[in-house]
C-alpha cells in the first residue's frame, strides 16, 4: 500500500468562532507534516490534505475534539507521492462558493443516497441525473447518462438550473459531485427553487468508487481530483491523466504527443486561446519550476489547486467585466 494518505473532508456546521482555530490547526498540520489546504468559514470546514497514516489520524482526532466538528465527512485514498507542496488553513466567507445568498444546507438539503443504493436510483427512467461538477472534470469521467451542465465554475450552476430545469417537469432530480460538498448546496438550492424530490450521492464519487465494486459500477472513466494526481481510477489510485500547467486541463499521453503540447506552456486545449505574452510568462514559470525541482524545492507556481483557483478567479473577473460592458 502507498505511504501517503490523501484525505478529503468537509462538514457544514455553524462555526461562529472559526477564526480562533486557524492558528492551532495550522500548527498541528505543520508539526505532523500534513500538507494541503483547509478552508474555514462560519458555515463549516472543507479541504483536502495528505500525510502519513498517523498524521492524518492525529489531524482527524484533533478536529473531532473541536465543538461541532465531530463526525466530519471524509474519504481516504492513497498515493505514492505527496500530492501537495504547501500547508494552508484559509479563512473564507463560504467553504464552497455558489454565490447565492441565503442557501444553507443546515436548514434544507436534498435526500442523501448511500453509494450501494445509487445505481438503483439513477437507473430509474423518471430520474434526471445531473453532474454538478465543472466541464473539465466531466470530460474525463462521469456516471452513465448523466447530464453535463457545461459550467466552468460552480457559480454558474444556479443559472443552469434557471435556464434548463423546471420543478413541474423534472419531478425527480439526482445530483453528484467529487466528494459530496457541492451537492450539499446544489440540492439546497433546488429545494429552495421548489423542486420536490431532490437526491444526492452521499460522500460523492470518491465514496462510490470506494464502496461499489468495479464490475457493478455505473461510473465511466476516471474522477478528477484537485491535487497533483489530477485524476483517480476506480481503485482510487492515480489515473492515466496528466495536467497542462498552462490551462490546468487534464490531458492524455496522446495529447502530450501533439505538436500543440509544450510542457508548461500549451496543449491542444489552450494553444489557440493564449497570447504570446502569456506563453512567454508560462515558459519562464516552467523554467523556474524545473530549476526549483533540481534544487529539491517546491516552486510556488507548482501548486495545482492554487493555480486552478487563480484560473477560475481570472475567468470570473473577465466574465463580470464583460457583463458590465453589456
UniProtKB/Swiss-Prot annotation:
Family per record: Belongs to the TrhO family.
Record domain Rhodanese: where: 123-217
Residue span of region Disordered: 304-326
Main enzyme class: oxidoreductase
Alphabetized GO MF terms: oxidoreductase activity, acting on paired donors, with incorporation or reduction of molecular oxygen
Active site per the UniProt annotation: 177
Annotated protein name in UniProt: tRNA uridine(34) hydroxylase
Catalytic activity: uridine(34) in tRNA + AH2 + O2 = 5-hydroxyuridine(34) in tRNA + A + H2O
Entry keyword annotation includes tRNA processing: yes
Name of the encoding gene: trhO
PANTHER family cross-referenced by the UniProt entry: RHODANESE-LIKE DOMAIN-CONTAINING PROTEIN 7-RELATED, THIOSULFATE SULFURTRANSFERASE/RHODANESE-LIKE DOMAIN-CONTAINING PROTEIN 2
EC identifiers of the protein: 1.14.-.-
HAMAP family associated with the record: TrhO
Keyword set, alphabetical order: Oxidoreductase, tRNA processing
GO biological process, one term: tRNA modification
Function: Catalyzes oxygen-dependent 5-hydroxyuridine (ho5U) modification at position 34 in tRNAs.
